[in-house]
Amino acid sequence: MASASEQMPLQTRGIFRNLPTFSSDLKDLTAIVTGANGISGFHTMRVLLESPQRWKKVWGASRRPPPEEMMALLSDEQRARVEHVALDFLSKPEEIASKLEAKGVTGDYVFFYSYAQPRPKPGQGAWSNAQELADTNTALLKNFLGALDIASITPKRFLLQTGAKNYGTHLGPARTPYVESDPPVTLEPNFYYPQQNCLWKYCDEHSIGWNIICPAWIIGAVNNAAMNALHPLAVYAAVQAHKGEKLDYPGDFNAWMGVTEHSSAMLTGYLSEWAVLEEKCANHKFNASDTCPLPNNRLWPELARWYGCDGYGGPELDESKLNVIDPGDVPTPLGYGPPRKLRYSWTLTQWAQDPTNAKAWKEIMEKHKLLTHDPFSDIEAHFTFGDFAAWGPAFALSMNKARYFGWTGHVDTLESLHLAYTELSKIGMLPPPVAAANPLI
């Protein structure tokens, strides 16, 4: 089959630039998007729904439908082409299949974003329960694949999204930039690997193609803040501005200067659509990033400006005042060298435990009547990932492979993050920014 987009002109959609266009011969397709109310699933649905001739029907599968405030981000025409299917992928495949059949679900293409985050033991890290994560998330995919068989749904392509933990970024120093052909990191259970094995076995048995997409920190607007790591940064900025204080930085100098990657959920959705529609991309894994490296020394001043803080503060330079997370003498993904030590002066989780800040947020909620979300109601769930994003390790995803196959999409991460914060204000998660975005140019 000829390339779906290679000979076609590029397009711009808002802040998202150099996006592919596709032949008009691609039309009347159907898609199943799982994890439809999550940050990646919802934005991939938004991408598909932008093309009514190409995608006549999108089935959104999740335990609960996206709430009305999220659906309000769609046009009436888009909402008419999406239908929710209430599915619990931890139930038996037969039960899942019966609900698919009852709805008459069809899927030329499947985009799998379902994810479960079992709560770790008190005091443990977000990914400390590695085996439980592996068991739970592998079961999600395995049950769904079994249900597709029972319901006689055989897609042309099945896309699974994993992430940068594929490269062991959470376990210590790894070879950078992260490249799709890098070998698995087997220092502890990683649910991405058994998920991949399930997918490959299913696709081999059914003679269909697969794709795996690996994003970094994901940017987008959904009302589930648990995995939206940059949401608590805006909460912090809004509260500091409300109190008339500056936006202090909690990490050390290395975290301040380290250049890291982000992955806007919309751009990753465009890349995912491109990957499944391109025949040459079948059976390939692709990294997904904005191609806009962004260190905290450039993010923090903009974050302070967007919310009207009284300036910003840099990292603590007196190392005697820093806390150190020292993993001890443990092996690293790199296979040699010292383990990674993380240094910080304070955490967002500690900051959120100050009653003054919770009180300030209540006052902000009173001021902005559309603001309904209170992240201080469950501090551990809402702020833990924010600490990782604020002063965690920097890393880089190689986009060489996607470019080699013809991908050209780009977004400025500052513009994308500002857009996400603006949309989060529309769905009751944040107050709106008070200043416009400036691209990093």
Predicted regions and their residues:
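N-terminal Rossmann NAD(P)H-binding glycine-rich loop of SDR-like oxidoreductase domains
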Residues: T12-R54
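NAD(P)H-binding glycine-rich loop region in Rossmannoid oxidoreductase-like domains
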Residues: A31, P67-M70, L74-A139, N143
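Conserved beta-loop-beta element that borders a ligand/cofactor-binding pocket
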Residues: Q161-T162, N197-M227
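Glycine-rich "substrate-gating" loop/helix at the edge of Rossmann-like oxidoreductase active sites
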Residues: P184-E188, A216-L230, D252-A265, C292
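Glycine/proline-rich active-site loop of Rossmann-fold NAD(P)-dependent oxidoreductases
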Residues: H206, G220-Y236, A275-F286
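A conserved pocket-lining segment of Rossmann-fold NAD(P)-dependent short-chain dehydrogenase/reductase
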Residues: V235-M266, K280, N287-S289
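Mid/C-terminal beta-alpha module of Rossmann-like enzyme folds, strongest
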Residues: L271-G386, S398, Y404, Y421-G428, ...
